[in-house]
Amino acid sequence: MYLNGRITRIFRLKKNSFRQQNFLYPLLLQEYIYSLAHYNSFNSLISYEPVEIIGYDNKSSLVLVKRLITRMYQQKSLISSLNDSNQNEFWGHKNSFSSHFSSQMVSEGFGVILEIPFLSRLVSSLEEKRIPKYQNLRSIHSIFPFLEDKLSHLNYVSDLLIPHPIHLEILVQILQCWIKDVPSLHLLRLFFHEYHNLNSLITSKKAIDVFSKRKKRFFWFLHNSYVYECEYLFLFLRKQSSYLRSISSGVFLERTQFYGKIEYLIIRCCNSFQKILWVLKDTFIHYVRYQGKAILASERTLILMNGWKFHLVNFWQSYFHFWVQPYRIHINQLPNYSFSFLGYFSSVRKNPLVVRNQMLENSFLINTLNNKLDTIVPAISLIGSLSKAQFCTVLGHLISKPIWTDLSDSAIRDRFCRICRNLCRYHTGSSKKQVLDRIKYILRLSCARTLARKHKSTVRTFMRRLGSGFLKEFFLEEEQSPSLIFLQKISFILHGLHRERIWYLDIIRINDLVDHS
């Protein structure tokens, strides 16, 4: 901890010296950058597999960083790395240190460096506007109470997929308005060409492997930068089409080249731009997004929703200069449609409600319908995620986890229990709990099979020896875990009992096994 605090203080001092001119390339040759990147990457890691910690000297040598950048700029080394990956000494997999260092530490360090101009503007913006720092505002579950309050009164919903693939040069141009450092941009282009599959890594719904052990800081930075550009077009139209002040857009950073692009578009369609804004004027529209998928909902008519779709597609095509497939935006009526978002199938259901009306001495009953947001867990998708992680088959049949048999019994139980608690805790907002009981059963028996395989015994014999209290922590109530929660009673009747929908407001990262979309 002392070493990390010292590195952080040095990093802040260096960052202030480079903040004015945004000249970031010399930071690549600073040794503490890679130590800081390694420390942050390790601490933010949520993994179910054992993590191999490599020493500081093996990953943060300044001489190796210089040699690495020099080799990257050598044309022969670049060509050989692209043509013959088996004989490549730099990017190849035969040299474990080179592959780990080049693909992990340099990209992580480069991501830390690229965040400097963004972080300085964000901190100054928050200080000027005096925005309070509430940790629960970062919760993923905080989206669902918002949807419960808003979607029940709306008519149409649009499923949006962020446009992809995108040309690599467009990513460089996106960052060019923030970073004026030409050597850093050249090095960024070189990184893009080395990661030849970057298109599928940063924008598609399979952006990062669901069960990957490490999520690259560098790729998250590129993903967020690109999504920011896509959303800024929407926020610009939303702000121009409504005279109401948008609170959500207050935290966005100031742009330098975006308005020049908009002026160019206004000149091209100056006669029809005001008509477009008049068509898009809608003060009752709501927008939420997670990763590459977004939800756009409104209480207006289908014509207005088609107008939003048409103009968003055209603005994306004009701004990014590539074809945006219109089929990526689906418009549906909320009462007749279920959409997948953040690991749930959500839909608006008609809930019958009987109200007793009292007028003087007479009373009578009124039957009415009330809209309720119904969120359920997709059993097939969740079991498919468990099968990819090799906890069961695609059909839900139990299997053991042979790669964990070298661990101790307590370590195996802790891993299974942690996965089970995380999944059940995240899905406590479901109106149907039968799927969660099935997930508990699969993980409990998979743990028993793994332990029985380790001790070379049968599952029945092993569980009989341990007794009925085996793995009772699998069935602990989710309400016992200490956290900030949001309770809401729902009218769904399951097995004759009223169930509570629970949203946890301290979940700031979606679990790997939850992100099965």
From Swiss-Prot:
One of the GO biological process terms: mRNA processing
The protein's name: Maturase K
Organism of derivation: Dracula chimaera
UniProtKB keywords: Chloroplast, mRNA processing, Plastid, RNA-binding, tRNA processing
Cross-referenced Pfam families: Intron_maturas2, MatK_N
Annotated function: Usually encoded in the trnK tRNA gene intron. Probably assists in splicing its own and other chloroplast group II introns.
Keyword Lyase found: no
An example molecular function term from Gene Ontology annotations: RNA binding
Gene Ontology cellular-component terms listed: chloroplast
UniProt signal peptide: none
Compartment(s): Plastid, Chloroplast
Phylogenetic lineage: Eukaryota, Viridiplantae, Streptophyta, Embryophyta, Tracheophyta
Family label: Belongs to the intron maturase 2 family. MatK subfamily.
Disulphide bonds in the chain: none
Domain of life from the UniProt record: Eukaryota
